[in-house]
A protein has these predicted regions:
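Acetyl-CoA-dependent GNAT
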Residues: 12-16, 34-95, 106-108, 112, ...
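C-terminal "cap" of GNAT-fold acetyltransferases
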Residues: 86, 127-134, 150-178
Length: 178
């Protein structure tokens, strides 16, 4: 994938990416579209990237070596009954939104989830007014499963989110008991 002739490279995030990730999460569009708080600390991101659990997978998208987006793919919970579930969250730097960065991150995350981790279900939450993100997730097979009313406090008021999920393409449910 390229943007203006420059390839988008997705790789594993490293602690050295903390400065760039802090810049991403300082952008007004990113703050408005995620559950992160404004004014993130570089040191907090450095620690988070250095200490993330083995079950978490952090990816970054780069253009010409510059980090312009990130995605976290996490276990769906500690319950053994949800080992088949992954949860994801992503962000793209404000000035790189709409340039294919989100699609590159999603392709890499789905390859990891489907081909290597064997997640059968991926979940995410997205603000109902984040139309570009909703369109991106739908493009990659996610469907809205419900509305979470007053799910998050954002910019002085409560905001709704959609719960979205995607089942692995080969997933089949057991037959319903009769």
């Amino acid at each position: 994938m390229t943007t203006t002739g420059h390839p988008i490279v997705v790789r594993r995030a490293e602690p050295r990416d903390a400065d760039a990730i802090q810049v991403i999460f300082s952008g007004p569009k990113v703050i408005a579209g995620t559950l992160q708080l404004p004014y993130p600390s570089v040191e907090a991101w450095r620690k988070r990237l250095a200490d993330f659990p083995a079950a978490d997978h952090w990816l970054v998208a780069t253009i010409d070596g510059e980090v312009v987006g990130n995605l976290g793919l996490h276990d769906g919970g500690k319950s053994p009954r949800r080992r088949h579930v992954g949860q994801l969250g992503m962000s793209v730097r404000d000035d790189r939104q709409g340039c294919g960065v989100g699609s590159a991150l999603m392709r890499a995350a789905l390859d990891l989830a489907d081909g290597w981790i064997n997640y059968q279900r991926l979940e995410l939450w997205v603000f109902t007014d984040n139309l570009a993100a909703i369109a991106l997730y739908r493009k990659f097979g996610f469907a809205i499963e419900g509305t979470c009313r007053a799910h998050a406090f954002r910019d002085g008021r409560y905001a709704d989110t959609y719960a979205m999920a995607r089942l692995h393409p080969s997933f089949t449910m057991a037959a319903e008991p009769q």
